[in-house]
Design a protein with these regions (language model features):
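Sec-dependent N-terminal signal peptides
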Residues: 5-14
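Sec/Tat signal peptide C-region and signal peptidase I cleavage site
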Residues: 17-23
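Central antiparallel beta-sheet cores of small beta-barrel/beta-sandwich binding domains
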Residues: 23-99, 142-144
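Long, low-complexity, proline- and polar/charged-enriched segments
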Residues: 80, 86-151
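SH3-family beta-barrel domains
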Residues: 132-163, 177-179, 187-190, 209-217
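Short alpha-helix capping/helix-loop boundary micro-motifs
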Residues: 168-172
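Residue-level recognition of short, solvent-exposed, well-ordered loop/turn junctions
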Residues: 173, 179-182
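SH3/SH3-like beta-barrel fold
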Residues: 181, 194-199
Length: 217
């Protein structure tokens, strides 16, 4: 059974190193970690985007808790963010609010457990201590990102198929494509286009993706 959830949540993320000027600094946990967490910082406009995925597995079944968030003014300690559901097959129609707090090298996510519909309230606790704790009616997710990078943003594919393009031009479509739910690291953008890298099982794929094929806030 897939999880149905919309999170009215307070996010506190501690650990995003912000670099001003011409340098870029973004962070991620290892892709196999549970929960997986990645954050992109765009120094040009101070925008932060991020993604979190937590899984609960059982024989023949995997339940997911995934979200995508975005905030502005990353040079400040507290950032208001918008949050959307990033779980495949579930609606992204509801826009929720949260907050990011930036300190040191630790990311912490605090969720009001009573506001988690569906099975998300038992997917997150399933991950267990020390990544997930429950205190005073809240689920607290803590991760330590070890991978730094230069991506400017994080995105998630919404279309059933999102083809790669050699250039930001419809005439340059390639055979390779991504599917709904795939996560992207965005390195550049043109009107209507993202230049992205996607880490596949065997190799990294890069190219241009149409913005309209991704989840938008």
């Amino acid at each position: 059974m897939k999880i149905r959830y919309l999170i009215n949540v307070l996010f506190i993320v501690t650990g995003l190193k912000i670099v001003h000027g011409s340098e870029q600094s973004s962070w991620s946990t290892e892709i196999y970690e549970n929960p997986y967490f990645t954050v992109g910082y765009d120094f040009r406009n101070g925008t932060v985007t991020g993604y979190m995925a937590a899984l609960r597995t059982a024989p023949g079944e995997t339940n997911e808790c995934k979200l995508l968030f975005k905030g502005d003014r990353a040079n400040k300690a507290n950032i208001s963010v918008k949050v959307v559901n990033a779980t495949v097959g579930q609606s992204q129609s509801a826009m929720l609010s949260g907050q990011l707090e930036i300190r040191n090298n630790r990311f912490q996510l605090v969720v009001n457990k009573s506001q988690l519909p569906g099975d998300c309230d038992w997917v997150l606790p399933f991950v267990g201590y020390p990544a997930v704790e429950e205190k005073s009616g809240q689920v607290i997710v803590t991760v330590l990102p070890m991978i730094s990078g230069v991506w400017r943003a994080v995105g998630v594919i919404q279309a059933k198929k999102a083809y790669f393009y050699q250039a930001p031009d419809e005439a340059t479509v390639q055979k390779a494509y991504l599917v709904s739910g795939d996560i992207l690291h965005i390195y550049d953008e043109k009107p209507g286009w993202y230049f992205v890298k996607f880490q596949g099982r065997k190799k990294e794929v890069l190219g241009w993706i149409r913005v309209r094929d991704t989840i938008q806030f």
